[in-house]
Regions:
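RecA-like P-loop NTPase motor core of helicase/translocase proteins
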Residues: 1-190
Length: 190
């Protein structure tokens, strides 16, 4: 179905259709997608590459709302490489909040930054049935000694998140290519 949907969008926008190949298919230019048993182990991976300042944050925030509205998906984690980028995402979210509320009939949602001093956030993320969007820096959960990975009275915060199989969005993924960071992202159980 993904291939059909991709072809439909490509055709509508005058983009050359992807070729279906053994083990996956190739989407030209900015949408590389490989489908194989190995690539599906941690879910499907889409790469959307856009020049700086062209609305990448808007695109993924709108995608979150579209996935929530059309498919009922409600658990989203935006992983960023630094506090500076996290702050930019938060600013963009604040600027577009009313816009998205109007476009999507004011969905009930929680949008917050992971705070290691508030470990209950992970449990709330997992148990709340409204749209949940958590912004987190990669360094907040990449190492075993991070609070996200430590046992508490209620369990490990990471275990609550893993149980939801969240949609994980990587902002600036080229800054998350080390094995430690890749394993940390896979550990979110997307």
């Amino acid at each position: 179905q993904i291939i059909k949907n991709t072809h439909k969008i490509q055709e509508k926008n005058g983009i050359e259709k992807s070729e279906v190949k053994e083990g996956g298919f190739s989407i030209p230019m900015t949408f590389p997608l490989e489908i194989s048993e190995k690539s599906l182990k941690h879910g499907m991976n889409f790469s959307i590459e856009m020049e700086t300042g062209t609305g990448k944050t808007y695109v993924y925030l709108r995608t979150i709302h579209e996935l929530h509205q059309h498919y009922g998906w409600s658990k989203f984690i935006i992983v960023v490489p630094s506090v500076a980028i996290r702050e930019g995402v938060l600013k963009n979210s604040a600027i577009t909040r009313e816009h998205f509320a109007n476009l999507y009939n004011k969905p009930e949602m929680d949008y917050y930054v992971w705070d290691s001093k508030k470990t209950g956030q992970a449990r709330e993320f997992a148990t709340n049935d409204t749209l949940q969007i958590m912004v987190i820096t990669i360094d907040s959960f990449a190492k075993a000694q991070n609070v996200m990975n430590k046992q508490s009275d209620y369990g490990r915060p990471l275990d609550f998140i893993k149980a939801t199989h969240p949609v994980v969005i990587l902002d600036e993924p080229q800054n998350m290519e080390t094995d430690i960071r890749r394993n940390a992202i896979a550990g979110l159980n997307p």
